[in-house]
Amino acid sequence: LFLTMGACNNTPKAPILLEAEKTIEKQPDSALNYLGRVNSDLQDALQAQEYYLRALEIGEDSKNYTLLIKIYNNLGTLYAYQDINDMALPMYKKVLSYLELEPDSVKTAFTLRNIARIYSLIQKSDSSIIYYKRAISYSAIKNKASILIDLGNLYLSLKDYKKAYQCIEKAEPLINNEKTLYPIYLSKGELYIATNQLDSAKFYLNHCVKSSNIHTRAGSLYHLAQIAQKEKNINDLIKYSNLYEQTRDSIVNSSHFENI
C-alpha cells in the first residue's frame, strides 16, 4: 500500500530548495509546506517533516484552511509512507476536521480512504469498513472504483467472500480501460482461489501478468504459483515461482535504489 521513504540528509541542496528558501519571509507557512513537499520528493523524510512542522507552527492559528489541509495531508502521507501509522492517523483526522470548515467532496473522499487504509493496517477492520463506506459516499464516479476495490480486498482478507465479490463487481463497470482493470482482475483471482474456483482464478491472473505495474505482476505470478501448487503442476510451479522471484527482486532492488 505505502512505500518506505529513506532519508538522504547528506545530499547537497538542490537549486529549487535554495530558491524556495528565499520566499520564506514573504509567505512562510506556504513556502515551508512547499519545501516539505520538495524534500519528501527527494526522499529526505526527516527534513520534510521539519519543514511541515515549522509550517504548522506559523500557520496553525490562521484561517487559511486550504493550506492547513495541505500541510496535515502531507504530514499524514509522509508518516504513512514510513509505516508510522499511529502518527499518520491523527494527521488525516485533522485534515477531515478542516474539511468540515472548508468542504471539498473530492478531498474528503480521499482523506476518508486514507484513514480507512490506516485502520486496515492496524487491524481495526470495523473502523476501516466504516471509513471506506463514507469515502464511497463522497467519491466521484471516476474515483469510486479504486475505493470499492480497497473495500473488497479488506472483505477478502476477512474471508467475507460474498461482500468482497459485491464490491469488486460494483467496481468493474466504473472502469473504462484495460490498464486500470488489472487491479480488479488481481482481486478476482485471489477471490476465486479462496473459493476454490481455480480455472476462473487462472483466467483473471493470466490477464494481470500483462500489467505494466510491477506490483500487480508480482501478485499475479505469486498466485499463479499457488494454483500450480494446489494442482500439483510441477512445471507451472517452477515457472511461476521463478518469474515471481525475479519480479520480487526487481521490486526490492528498485526500493533499495530509491532509499540510497
Language-model region placement:
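Conserved alpha-helical positions within TPR/SEL1-like repeat arrays
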Residues: 21, 33-41, 66-81, 106-121, ...
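Amphipathic alpha-helical segments of tetratricopeptide repeats
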Residues: 54-58, 63, 94-103, 133-137, ...
